[in-house]
């Protein structure tokens, strides 16, 4: 873990963000591996339009690694925060997913009848939206959140500030 602080990418990031003169520390978190049926990313502020009244959720089958790595194109859902209303749904065909198999992660093929189905129901989109809003309010800044859905329950596996916004929100 400590060596990751000294990679060129990490050093450049700290200089770019003005953090090169601050003390740096590393925390190690141990958490349960969630065998997610569906997983994804959520942004508490729309990352493209930077509209602070919209959040965006991306969802795909299996583990979130497939989305984070860019290996699949996830569904995307835009929610208007103050009205708690879904205003846009884009469903992507997903042919494969990463799943936990013993000690490894493996790619599996998605059944043809499920490939073009909306990954999260509208009800679940709104439920996850509430969690995203609570996390943003808790931290007091726009958040980039990784989530997993297993056996009817959402798990938040990571939350961090959105660092790409140009506007100050």
Predicted segments with their positions:
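Conserved mixed alpha/beta core segments that line enzyme active sites in large multi-domain catalysts
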Residues: 1-169
């Amino acid at each position: 873990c400590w060596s990751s602080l000294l990679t060129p990418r990490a050093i450049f990031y700290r200089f770019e963000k003005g953090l090169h003169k601050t003390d740096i520390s590393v925390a190690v978190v141990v958490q349960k591996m969630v065998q997610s049926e569906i997983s994804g990313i959520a942004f508490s502020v729309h990352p493209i339009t930077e509209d602070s009244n919209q959040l965006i959720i991306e969802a795909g089958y299996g583990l979130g690694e497939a989305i984070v790595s860019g290996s699949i194109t996830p569904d995307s859902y835009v929610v208007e925060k103050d009205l708690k209303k879904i205003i846009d749904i884009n469903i992507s065909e997903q042919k494969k997913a990463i799943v936990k198999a013993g000690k490894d992660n493996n790619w599996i093929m998605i059944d043809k009848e499920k490939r073009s189905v909306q990954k999260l129901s509208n009800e679940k989109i709104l439920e996850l939206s509430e969690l995203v809003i609570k996390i943003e309010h808790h931290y007091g800044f726009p958040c980039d959140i990784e989530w997993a859905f297993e056996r009817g329950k959402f798990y938040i596996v990571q939350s961090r500030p959105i660092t790409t916004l140009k506007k100050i929100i």
